Amino acid sequence: MTPEEFRRAGHELIDWVADYRERVARAEFPVMARTTPGALRAALPSAPPQSPEEFAAIRRDLDELILPACTHWLDPRFHGYFPSNGLPAAVLGDLVSTGLGQLGLNWQSSPALTELEEVCLDWWRQMLGLSERWSGVIQDTASTATFVALVCARERASNHAATRGGLQSQASPLIVYVSSQAHSSVEKAALLAGFGRACMRSIETDADHAMKADALVAALEDDAAHGLKPCAVVATCGSTATTAMDPIARIAEAAKKAGAWLHVDAAMAGSGMIVPECRPLWQGVEAADSLVFNPHKWLGTGMECSAYYVRDPQHLVRVMSTNPSYLRTAHEGEVKNFRDWGIQLGRRFRALKLWFLIHEQGVRGLQARIRRDLEHAQWLKAQVDAAKDWERVAPVQLQTVCVRHLLPGRDPAAVDVHNLGIAQRVNASGVAYVTPAVLKGQQMIRVSIGAVATERQHVEQVWAALQQAARA
């Protein structure tokens, strides 16, 4: 493809993306892809093309094969999982990132990549109201960030002996403590870090689905009394099921007393902390050792962009650094080499989409969208609370409303089947998308508000769809 051909194709694709977003906003597509497993695979050639193809053929397949197999996360009626927004400014930042072909092996391989990431992560720190004691780096996802945090916790608890001799070299097993509502990625991170399920403690939650600090204290003390070593506590700030907020201040106090690392998983809720009125929800976060939040969810940078912050970057670098001779530079003592801040050696220029987004939206623009979604969630909460045959099963802390339709006098198992059916009927209709989930043994329906284009009319629409599906 020549530069001129690229220019023509690029203009065409920018128009295509802009048109797609307009069509999504007009609700031209069913929110959930209407396809069956294997349908796209069967429609595509089983072998790669041997000769170059015209760009028009690629465009045709994009329209006729790829797009029909997409679930439309940008649709204003998408209320499943959590938001995965990619604002236009971030899309353009991603385009420039790929177009520049930068590779962040070390500072020298791309000074712009390294230093823009430093600046953007410090901007986010300020937007979150965090102190200057925090230093940040972009990871691909919160799963990776949590894994890095638990490896750092393991090395601090073992005085770096685990790196030399492995966990089997430890006389006392190292224990990790998580909420029973913690994301599955926390368990996976602990397993990959070598802890094993026998060395994980699932701490019970209260009526609001937040970790019970007293139960954590009891578990820490019991393990210590039996010769085990508390290593890490993972507090959840905005759980996946209900956006429950663990009491970070009390958890931090317990972790500090036990000598355990405290990692805060704020993958979703962290975005909300750019509005000051949300910050009481993570009171005590300054006492944590590390925290993560995902701008690629609610804020709109697009995947993959996970902001990981630590209070002791020297410890992080000691744990993660290998520093072979071929990666050293003449400026080694003057610069940050982000390869030593995580797993990846080769790093994409992710900060560009952050930079584009913050410039194009401004802090006030991003805050306004968060506040809009919070207001929509409170509106839906009020509707559910006023309906005699519906109940909320969790507090509405942020933008997620968890509901359940009631069938008085019916067997609980039948009510579970009924609520699962409601979610399935809404999703199959194409008029909205919600997530069925199980909370403490009961089937419920999650309505997660936060797509960029979602306005009050779309929240009213999903509420009407839920009521209609309940009557079906």
Model regions: which residues?
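Glycine- and acidic
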Residues: 3, 44, 100-108, 130-137, ...
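N-terminal entrance/gating region of PLP-dependent enzymes' catalytic architecture
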Residues: 1-133, 424-428, 432, 450-452, ...
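PLP-dependent enzyme catalytic core of the Aspartate aminotransferase-like
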Residues: 439-472
